[in-house]
């Protein structure tokens, strides 16, 4: 079932704002009345989605797995490239301060993360560990996806 969300202000404090097709990813919760449905928290945006070898991948899925690893910092970037007909995804991840990117524990964490991503998402990725500050930072919204594929 296709549902188009419409948002508006219900108070007199602001002008009514109506937005269509917000591209927010969420799901409707069971409601008590048809006109008063509630939504679960927004999990991401559909325009952040990457298609890798026919698999829909969201940066938030990768971030969820990164945050489970104690050796890795939450600073990452997904780099998309194309070699021949195949799309490749490389994830650049910073290690936490005091953890060397080429150290045994960091490499073990990267290998485990690579396996978890393959199982969870269904597509293999390359992991490249960087030291603190090695992943490009941006002002405002973090730039999580860099697409280097030729259009």
Write out the residue ranges for each language-model feature.
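Active-site glycine/GP-rich loop and adjacent strand/helix microenvironment
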Residues: 4-151
């Amino acid at each position: 079932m296709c549902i188009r969300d419409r948002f508006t202000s219900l108070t007199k404090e602001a002008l009514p704002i109506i937005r269509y097709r917000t591209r927010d990813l969420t799901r409707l919760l069971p409601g008590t009345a048809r006109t008063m449905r509630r939504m679960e928290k927004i999990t991401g945006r559909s325009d952040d989605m990457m298609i890798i070898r026919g698999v829909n991948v969201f940066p938030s899925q990768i971030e969820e797995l990164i945050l489970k690893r104690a050796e890795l910092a939450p600073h990452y970037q997904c780099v998309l490239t194309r070699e021949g007909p195949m799309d490749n995804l490389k994830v650049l991840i910073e290690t936490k301060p005091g953890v060397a990117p080429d150290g045994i524990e960091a490499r073990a964490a990267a290998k485990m993360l690579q396996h978890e991503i393959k199982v969870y998402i269904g597509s293999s990725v390359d992991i490249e560990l960087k030291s603190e500050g090695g992943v490009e930072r941006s002002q405002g919204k973090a730039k999580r996806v860099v697409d280097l594929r030729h259009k």
